[in-house]
From Swiss-Prot:
Organism in which the protein naturally occurs: Mycosarcoma maydis
Keywords, in A-Z order: Endoplasmic reticulum, Glycoprotein, Hydrolase, Membrane, Protein transport, Transmembrane, Transmembrane helix, Transport
Pfam families named in the record: PGAP1, PGAP1_2nd, PGAP1_TMD
Role according to the record: Involved in inositol deacylation of GPI-anchored proteins which plays important roles in the quality control and ER-associated degradation of GPI-anchored proteins.
A single GO BP: GPI anchor biosynthetic process
Record's subcellular location: Endoplasmic reticulum membrane
Gene: BST1
Gene3D superfamilies membership: alpha/beta hydrolase
Membrane topology, as annotated: Multi-pass membrane protein
Signal peptide stretch: none
EC number(s) on file: 3.1.-.-
The UniProt record lists the keyword Endoplasmic reticulum: yes
Protein name as it appears in the record: GPI inositol-deacylase
Family of the protein in this entry: Belongs to the GPI inositol-deacylase family.
């Protein structure tokens, strides 16, 4: 990647992307908000009622809680007033675990329902009739609930581990309190008591985690029911500790546990119920155990479904309502009651028999919970307890007899019936019908038939149904499954018939699909509809109690494998009454419809993204035997079925367009259905067609009853119906992002359509095909609703991808700046709007921003395709389930076409989000800086201390290092690393503001200060995008701090958030930047590549893994901070010597602080030397030659000194001495001249090294004594920022030109001929002009007491030196302690170095004085500067001496104390000597100073390089 031409950029492109992205975001957000209306879903939950009371048991936990968590959390026992007789425990324990920010009081809905189903409502403790035979103290559940202080467990794995640890301690306490009873073989309490758990949201994760902790009570937790729990992956992937928890609980089970029959190896029964589409707080996809492949090796250990599939509810439920929804709480409460009633509470008995076979109690407990939840067919996700067919031992395994599921042995009664006579099983009359197994019509038809029976009659009392207390009801319909076997008593021709009764729990409750009654239909109009009529009520409705007998329909389905396994020969249906009791009370007509159907017999045809479903031409060829009275005489099946393979998706919403057949339309126009019709008319229409669409992998389903609605029938009879399709929305949970793809045997959508055969009778006078109630069903994609579903699943996109794009753009800018450090480092806004990127194969013909986004999108799409290929090829990846890293890459989809369409859209939205964030923050800093400056607060935010030059050896400030060590040590001992990250964020915020204020104050080289500000701002931008990951945890930590203090509980997670490495690199980098300097360029290609690689790693993790593993972006940024800190440290340690970039060693990158900025300018870059080819020693010397990098103490000149543009200073320009190299500039460039120059160079180099070492020793001694003086006087009286601005200059520079004719040195830079010679001497300043003041020189003043803006400090009045002409532009604001005085009264005078050319110096004289000037105009009453001659000043001073008393001369030490200490005076002496030796002041030989020697080395180096270049050119010419 190289720098592209700025002229080819389209500056409007970022804003165009912003407009397009805002359109996409608006479209998606609008779809998300209107998602329930678009999908036709609404929450239909009845409100639950209860009388709660809580009894605190926390004090009893202390002996069972060695971790000390009993001080942090609490345990309560729930009691329902007016039902439960006493507050003491009376039954079996059950525990409720709240979720993220959940309350312990959420248990009241389920616990209240359990009490109301078990006790009568009088408070006497009397049981209901169905529980009167239950063992005492077993069946009833004592509900305990845990108070987790409403912790945010979704954001912290540490919190989850602490909660799981406390759950284990509570279970140990409850097992001890509810000790098992004594038996003949065991003493009391010898066997473990099980404690089933009900958990909401993240509480389910904590409950599952208990088995992986050291204090887990083995065998005491055998049932975990979870509500809206994200089992597959974390809902908020901001913390690596949460991912660690998920990796523990989702580890596949060992093969030994699958085959073991030991009770200790039996996993807990895990029941997962998800809320569905209305749960927008947490997507319900990860709640599917089947789709996540959790526990699929032991299918009987799991149940997974959605609330929309639960009978009597059939509604999606939001995240909170899943706890109080009345229809759901009745099922859950009854499931716990039945579980304890049937299997007791002793752990060994409940887990006996292993995990498979008829003896497995686990299978029986699963069957009980399936019945309690009323799960049938595809609603029991993952193929029920069978599991995926890919994992079955063999195809014949399904037909084995031990596959029969039951709760109690012989629960389905069987009896013998004669084969002839009136009581024969084959006898048929008007109320009794026999359905024989259809004959095989071909080899392909084997096993394709299934039996369907639908009725609204009562089929018996079902106590195992989880729909509240069962209502007494008569048996109005009986179904028997009969088998004919040879009779042993009559071996010749005798047959014996054995029939098994179909029990009530085998019937599935389905929604009612009423056909409009014609007598009522004729009385109503479209404007006046009676909503109280059953056929006019919406579905589902919270006001309807569907499980009341006679309202909803009952369905019996007998699949082919069940009929084969039980060897059924025929099915006998006996109707006990003509009209049902409950049906008649509602004014409805009783009906029974049954018949055979072929499974998955429909035809599919794909049209682009749409799918067309039609009937198979041969699907109506069915064999019905003796079905008179129940079914029509035609051979039309009662149901049609389509299987859509690979059609499952959670991201796509669809529209169903159903076209009714003409036969159905004609029959709807002619049928007759009367109210309260008690007669038996088997051929009359009885119910409206209805449909169900379900996903076999997840168990999610959607019912569409009453396809022939009253409005449609009304239009048909009015002849206004024109054949328009009936439209319904559809969205199911299926294959989802970051989830394993569904198994092939489960990856299907099933569409089922039921039709009353009476509505498909031949129409008199018309020849119409009457094979089906619909001509076609079209499924098409609803793109608007799909946008809302995509937004629901990819909400964390904005937490990762903007950071990735920012990192890539800043990395490109950093690489370019490293190559060309003479350019300022670009701002973040410039980096993202004008990225330095060259599009491969196209170059500058495409805008760099467009090329960058396009290349990123193509790379991600190709990477996603490679990921899919690897996942399908690696069996180990599929075995890992949701923990596979391949699933979490990019978008985590298993459809490459979907990824290719979404990735460009996501990139545009991410870029627009980044653009808005960066622009707002960058503009906000400008606004804040303006406000701070306006109110005069800038000086309070000034840098503390002085940042030394880049060429200085890296020195360590003890106080700063101590603070850094304490901060890092606090991470280990006291606070989590997230808290320190927040501190570093705030510190970097302050650093960035300081850098901007200094940039606006114009106190230093603008290029370096601009680079520093942009670097600080770039790092801050990345910290801003990372802040949400850590701020979420801090909320939990602060809450815990308020509740239990700083003490950490004794758990395995005690030190998870106290890892020093999680924050140390960020702390070090921000600490380095807090010193007031910018980060140095790379010294070598290796370092440059390392920095670019660090930014690339952040971009890689953010774009590739950022959505699923967001926390990895923080780890990548940590590594980037480490690389930046190490490279900066190496550059500082070596004086920022870079042989990677050519010719920029002496650029303006030296001083970056208020204290030293502007003191000396850089030499300027060398134009003729290739440093990359120079020896290391020569390069090291040249890197240190820039006088701007010489170690000059910050007290040598005031911090406000800022060189003027256009002037000359001691430290600026390439000074040269023509006399030294005069001979080297001649035309004759022989080898003797070159040897002579090299010898001279080595001699000067030796003198330079000795002079510099001596200067360093003096500086070290002076600083040591200054430190001792600080200890003696105190930091408040002697600080690093102190400087008496009233002092005059004590340094005089003499610039002379020996000969203008000799000033032209061949090959030397142009500026070298301007200054012939520089000599520096220290002089005694003349303070006589101060003797006219009325005040003493040194006077303590309180700035807050100064009342007038025109008063000056201590009455001083400054005059300029002789011959110096000043203008208003020569004056700058003072710096130091009095900068930005609030009242403008204390303004420091500043020293101005004046740059004078050789010609000017010769005309004015041989001496130029650097002196002080008065403050800016407007800050003093003497707004005009007095420029006088020396004689005038002497006259004036003479007059002063006659009238005024001579004041004390100013001294640098008097500002620190009235009587300076010996250490302070010693420091002054040493530092003054060091400065003299550095500048060559008071030296008899003008060339002995470090400055002069460095300049001579510079000239000699340039001359030698020029001679080499000239010799090389002459050699080439001679060769030619």
């Amino acid at each position: 990647m190289t720098t592209t031409s700025r002229s080819g950029r389209q500056l409007w492109l970022p804003w165009l992307i912003l407009v397009v992205s805002l359109t996409l975001i608006t479209y998606s957000v609008d779809s998300f908000i209107r998602l329930p209306q678009q999908l036709g879903v609404s929450q239909q939950c009845r409100m639950s009622r209860m009388w709660p009371a809580y009894i605190d048991h926390t004090s009893n936990l202390e002996p069972f809680s060695p971790s000390g968590l009993w001080r942090k959390y609490r345990l309560y026992l729930y009691r329902e007033r007016h039902f439960e007789p006493m507050d003491l425990p009376t039954g079996s324990p059950a525990l409720f675990v709240p979720g993220n920010s959940g309350s312990y009081g959420q248990v009241r809905s389920v616990a209240s329902s359990a009490s109301r189903q078990f006790y009568k409502e009088n408070g006497s403790g009397a049981r209901r009739d169905e529980w009167k035979d239950a063992p005492p103290g077993v069946a009833h559940t004592d509900w305990y609930t845990i108070d987790f202080n409403e912790d945010f467990s979704a954001f912290s794995g540490t919190t989850l581990i602490e909660q799981a640890t406390f759950i284990n301690e509570v279970v140990s306490y409850l097992s001890d309190r509810y000790a098992s009873a004594a038996t003949h073989s065991y003493a009391a309490g010898e066997r473990n008591t099980t404690v089933p758990i009900l958990a909401h949201s993240m509480g389910g994760i904590a409950a599952r985690l208990t088995a992986h902790l050291p204090n887990y009570p083995v065998g005491n937790i055998d049932t975990i029911v979870t509500l809206s729990t994200p089992h597959a992956f974390p809902p908020v992937p901001f913390d690596s500790s949460v991912e660690y928890v998920y990796s523990l609980i989702n580890t596949p089970l060992d093969a030994s546990r699958v085959t073991s029959r030991s009770a200790r190896n039996v996993p807990p029964l895990l029941v997962s119920i998800a809320g569905g589409l209305l749960d927008t707080q947490l997507p319900s996809d990860p709640s599917s155990l089947s789709l996540a492949r959790i526990g699929e090796a032991i299918a009987p250990s799991r149940i997974s479904t959605y609330t929309g599939s639960l009978p009597s509810l059939w509604s999606s439920v939001d995240h909170v309502a899943v706890m109080w929804c009345d229809q759901l709480r009745e099922k859950i409460a009854r499931g716990f009651l039945l579980d304890m009633m049937a299997f007791g509470r002793v752990s060994d008995e409940r887990n006996a028999g292993g995990v498979s076979g008829r003896s497995s109690v686990l299978r029986r407990r699963r069957e009980l919970w399936r019945r309690a939840l009323s799960l049938f067919d595809v609603s029991d996700a993952g193929n029920g307890e069978i599991g995926p067919l890919e994992l079955t031992p063999s195809p014949d395994w399904l037909l084995e007899e031990d596959r029969e599921t039951f709760v109690v042995e012989n629960e389905s009664p069987s009896f013998q019936r004669p084969t002839s006579g009136p009581d024969s099983a084959l006898s048929v009359d008007q109320q009794n019908t026999v359905f024989r197994i259809p004959a095989r019509m071909g080899d392909s038809d084997d096993g394709l038939h299934a039996f369907e029976l639908i009725t609204n009659l009562c089929v018996g009392w079902n106590p195992s149904s989880g729909m509240g207390a069962p209502l007494p009801q008569p048996v109005e319909l009986v179904v028997q499954l009969c088998t004919s076997n040879p009779d042993s008593s009559d071996p010749v021709s005798g047959q014996r018939t054995s029939c098994r009764l179909v029990m009530p729990w085998q019937w599935e409750l389905i929604p009612p699909s009423f056909l409009p009654r014609t007598d009522i239909l004729m009385q109503e109009s479209s404007q006046h509809i009676d909503t109280h009529l059953p056929e006019n009520r919406p579905f589902p409705s919270a006001d309807e109690i569907y499980h009341v007998p006679g309202y909803a329909f009952q369905r019996l389905r007998l699949d082919a494998d069940l009929l084969q396994r039980q060897r059924i020969d025929w099915i006998r249906v006996e109707r006990k009454t003509d009209s049902g009791v409950f049906v008649h009370q509602r004014g409805l007509k009783s009906f029974v419809r049954g018949g055979w159907m072929r499974q998955a017999a429909g035809r599919l045809k794909k049209h682009g993204s749409s799918l067309l479903l039609t009937q198979d031409q041969d699907s109506d060829i069915q064999h019905h035997y003796q079905d008179a009275g129940f079914a029509t005489t035609s051979a039309i099946p009662i149901a049609s079925e389509w299987l859509l393979k690979g059609f499952s998706s959670s991201l796509l919403a669809r529209r169903i367009e159903l076209v009714p057949s003409q036969c159905l339309v004609e029959n709807l126009a002619l049928y007759t259905l009367q109210s309260n019709d008690e007669s038996l008319h088997s051929t009359d229409a009885s119910f409206s067609p209805f449909m169900r669409v379900s996903d076999r992998a997840t168990g999610d389903s959607r019912w569409y009853p009453q396809l022939a609605s009253p409005e449609l029938v009304r239009r048909i009879r009015a002849r206004t119906y024109k054949g328009e399709p009936i439209t319904f929305p559809l969205s199911l949970h299926g294959n989802a992002p970051f989830m394993p793809p569904a198994r092939d045997s489960l990856n299907e959508i099933r569409v089922q359509l039921w039709t009353d055969q009476a509505l498909l009778r031949p129409v008199p006078g018309k020849s119409l095909p009457c094979r089906s109630s619909v001509d076609s069903i079209r499924l098409s994609v609803d793109w608007k609703a799909s946008a809302g579903l995509v937004l629901l699943r990819y909400r964390f996109l904005l937490a990762a991808w903007p950071l990735g794009l920012l990192s890539v753009c800043i990395g490109l800018s950093w690489l370019t700046w490293t190559q060309k450090p003479e350019l300022p480092f670009p701002s973040p806004l410039t980096s993202i709007t004008q990225p330095v990127f060259r599009t491969p194969f196209i170059g500058n013909r495409v805008d760099p921003l467009l090329g960058l986004l396009a290349c990123t999108a193509i790379a991600l799409i190709l990477l996603d395709g490679m990921r899919l290929w690897l996942y399908r090829c690696m069996s180990s990846a599929e075995a890992r389930g949701p923990t596979s890293s391949l699933i979490g890459m990019v978008l985590g989809l298993h459809n490459h076409a979907s990824s290719a369409g979404l990735i460009p859209c996501f990139l545009l939205v991410s870029y627009a989000t980044l653009l808005v964030i960066v622009a707002i923050i960058q503009w906000s800093f400008s606004l804040i800086a303006a406000i701070v400056t306006r109110f005069g607060l800038a000086h309070k935010l000034d840098w503390v201390g002085a940042a030394t030059a880049s060429s200085d050896p890296l020195k360590w400030n003890r106080r700063s290092m101590a603070g850094l060590a304490i901060l890092l040590l606090s991470v280990v001992l006291l606070v989590p690393h997230q808290f320190v990250f927040l501190i570093m964020f705030l510190l970097q915020l302050l650093n960035t503001l300081r850098a901007l204020l200094e940039l606006q104050s114009n106190r230093g080289p603008p290029q370096s200060q601009e680079s520093r500000f942009h670097q600080h701002l770039s790092i801050l931008m990345m910290l801003v995008l990372l802040l949400p990951q850590k701020a979420s945890f801090l909320v939990t930590w602060v809450r815990n701090l308020a509740s239990v203090g700083i003490k950490t509980p004794n758990t395995m997670a005690a030190w998870m958030d106290h890892n020093l490495l999680d924050v140390a690199p960020i702390v070090v980098l921000v600490w380095l930047m807090a010193g007031g300097r910018m980060l140095e360029p790379a010294r070598s290609k290796m370092e440059a590549k390392a920095i670019v690689f660090g930014f690339s790693i952040v971009g890689w993790y953010a774009l590739v893994w950022g959505i699923r593993y967001t926390y990895r972006t923080y780890d990548a940024f940590n590594a980037l901070c480490l690389v930046l800190a190490v490279c900066h440290w190496r550059s500082r340690r070596a004086g920022s010597r870079s042989h990677y970039s050519q010719g920029h060693a002496a650029c303006n990158v030296a001083k970056h602080s208020d204290e030293t900025s502007g003191m000396l300018h850089a030499h300027g870059k060398d134009e003729g030397v290739n440093l990359g080819d120079a020896p290391a020693e020569e390069f090291e010397l040249r890197s240190g030659l820039a006088s701007a990098r010489l170690p000059i103490h910050h007290l040598a000149l005031p911090s406000s000194v800022d060189p003027q543009s256009g002037g000359a200073s001691i430290a600026e320009g390439n000074a040269s001495t023509c006399a030294v190299v005069e001979s080297s500039a001649q035309t004759n460039l022989g080898g003797d001249k070159l040897d002579e120059l090299i010898a001279d160079y080595l001699d000067v180099l030796d003198r330079y090294q000795r002079a510099r070492n001596a200067t360093s020793a003096l500086f070290s001694s002076g600083y040591l004594k200054l430190t001792r003086a600080k200890i003696e006087l105190g930091a408040s009286r002697l600080s690093s920022n102190s400087y008496d601005s009233r002092l005059l200059a004590e340094v005089r520079a003499t610039i002379s030109n020996e000969s203008s004719s000799q000033s032209s040195c061949g090959g030397l830079p142009a500026q070298a001929s301007e200054i012939s010679h520089i000599s520096v001497a220290r002089v005694q300043p003349d303070y006589s002009h101060l003797e006219n003041d009325d005040y003493v020189l040194i006077q303590d003043m309180d700035e807050s007491k100064v009342e007038k803006a025109d008063s000056t400090i201590a009455g001083l009045r400054r005059r300029a030196a002789v011959g110096v002409t000043l203008s208003e532009t020569d004056v700058v604001e003072g710096s130091g302690p009095h900068k930005h005085s609030p009242r403008g009264s204390l303004n420091d005078s500043v020293l101005r170095p004046v740059r004078v050319s050789a010609a000017d110096a010769e005309g004015r004289g041989d001496a130029i004085k650097m002196s002080a000037v008065q403050p800016e105009k407007g800050h003093s009453k003497n707004s005009k500067y007095d420029v006088i001659s020396t004689n005038q000043g002497d006259d004036q001073l003479g007059r002063m001496e006659q009238t005024k008393k001579v004041a004390a001369k100013p001294d640098a030490l008097l500002q620190f104390g009235g009587l300076p200490s010996t250490a302070l005076r010693g420091a002054q002496v040493d530092l003054r000597k060091a400065l003299n030796q550095l500048l060559g002041a008071e030296s008899h030989v003008h060339d002995d100073g470090v400055l002069q020697l460095a300049l001579r080395l510079e000239v000699l180096t340039s001359a030698i390089s020029t001679l080499k270049a000239t010799a090389a050119n002459q050699s080439e010419c001679e060769k030619r």
